[in-house]
């Protein structure tokens, strides 16, 4: 038994499922999860000392690579001054100014400690600002584990929310309406049936929680138009896409100005940080300037702010955005070429520093229904073959993968070599 397997067995005695976030348990791919001991650059090292080229990147934050010396030094320096004050600091101001400069739609912003806090707070703010209770999200899009966002209503239940998790009251869930991603007609139908009742649309500009699905042409423009017509707010959940798709986030990449934006992951440089912000007139509704209450003991934590500030300053250095996108495109194209070589149907998507691949013969994958038609069993086999070859992909067919600026040609070549071998095995097994 490996040390990872031993640790997993031990963890299950005191931690539900042995993990502190479900996807880490490898339920989506089978087998026992690897337990990580340390990480450096593009690599993670498990408890048995084996190295893996990492394309999970702590689920997105490690855009500069693991254990970056500048971020590490910033954290150490901040920690030496104190771990938490529960009072404002100058670093919070500098951080807010930097984010607002990089993402101009965020005229004002509030720091929180996670992406879930960011989306939860933005939803409350949208409801308070508009005086409306209902919200609209998209099937297959994930916005954190707040009750109002843990709703997945599809097919015949587009206008009546239903809990996708026990513990979400059915009556409460009815306030969350669910449309089909990349389908403006479904959005218009919901607004028509709920005239003057919808506070906001919340959307992942690139859907990264059903693998990686970019918007079809005109989708975000249509959402912006509908919100303007209906008096609803448009919220971009950029927890995953923020600073990864482009320096100015996905909203800059697609040239769309949302009313509110939610950030997480990259903004903390590996530390627990989230933020939400947007139009000044909307943000003024947040306490203490307005009636919508939001607070947090660790919001604006000085150590986390130091990490995030260092990360964003490094990230915005000239050429980094193009370098990251180029690396990711090379990898995504390589996967597709190798799949074609071995006669395995595969569809690959890539936007900036995130990518995803689907084992499918569909010509397009644009929504959750399309994703469910993909070959999950083949993905599981590919995942474990790649893991055996020292490549760590997202352990779920429904999650995006990420590159970092630390991934060099050596790692990319080794990854594609592993993919070539893995796909060859799958092709042979399919005969």
From Swiss-Prot:
Pathway: Porphyrin-containing compound metabolism; protoporphyrin-IX biosynthesis; 5-aminolevulinate from L-glutamyl-tRNA(Glu): step 2/2. Its cofactor is pyridoxal 5'-phosphate. SUPFAM superfamilies: PLP-dependent transferases. One of its GO terms (cellular component) is cytoplasm. One of its GO terms (biological process) is protoporphyrinogen IX biosynthetic process. Its EC number is 5.4.3.8. It is an enzyme of class 5 (isomerase). GO terms for molecular function: glutamate-1-semialdehyde 2,1-aminomutase activity; pyridoxal phosphate binding; transaminase activity. The modification N6-(pyridoxal phosphate)lysine is found at residue 265. It is found in: Cytoplasm. It catalyses: (S)-4-amino-5-oxopentanoate = 5-aminolevulinate. Pfam families: Aminotran_3 (PF00202). Belongs to the class-III pyridoxal-phosphate-dependent aminotransferase family. HemL subfamily. Homodimer. This is Glutamate-1-semialdehyde 2,1-aminomutase. It comes from Vibrio atlanticus (strain LGP32) (Vibrio splendidus (strain Mel32)).
